[in-house]
């Protein structure tokens, strides 16, 4: 019988001096409240722009699946070498005739009550097709051209405390940019993560299971810590819990930071029957 190692990982980063406090991490998933248009205008980034006439949508959202469908949506003049064609011919692409080419804009007004001075804020896009330009409160926070990757942006400098914030996202699918239907729009979830100044960054935890036996398993965890200016890594320690599917703690480990560890906690936990 193989040991089941499907465990939940719980991590707390503790400051060793003065007041000890666990890391606070608040995550928001932005699903409702979005406005959408296929028009294109530079004024759409402005927080006070009136988008009341835009379409109300829920994210994830794909603008192309609603049609209209047709050959003109991706008409191409090309020679398809795989089909033995020697000269360019008219084709409808291989994208199913969906109207994915062109520009789309999304806007959202949102609150972030956990954000305050000294906190860090990260926007995470699980999927945005494509050439995403992201604006927060009228300022460009970042650009990500590739539509198939999750990406994240540090929006701490642009977020406002204690008031509404405005997120605007411009997406553009270019002509002849795909050999299949690639999707269109914010086709996966959008998240805002607010952390303390000392925090585990996005994708800052690496977990492997180098040994899995019938009666025990070893779990190796590497956790990166972003250390605030003026602080030292050896002033922090990490407390890690592994929980089973029912939420029961099956093993724990603590480790103090060291100035020789390059701001990475390395731990090996053993889980046994």
Q: Can you describe what each PLM-predicted range is?
A:
Residues 1-25:
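Bacterial Sec-dependent N-terminal signal peptides
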Residues 22-87, 166-172, 186, 192:
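Accessory carbohydrate-binding/adhesion or oligomerization-edge regions at the termini
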Residues 26-30, 37-40, 96-209, 228, ...:
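Accessory beta-strand-rich segments of carbohydrate-active enzymes
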Residues 39, 59, 143, 252-254:
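Residue-level detector of high-confidence beta-strand sites
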Residues 136, 217-258, 265-267:
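Beta-strand-rich binding/interaction modules
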Residues 149-151, 261-272:
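Aromatic sugar-binding surface patches on proteins
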Residues 209-217:
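Short, solvent-exposed loop/linker segments at the N-terminal edge
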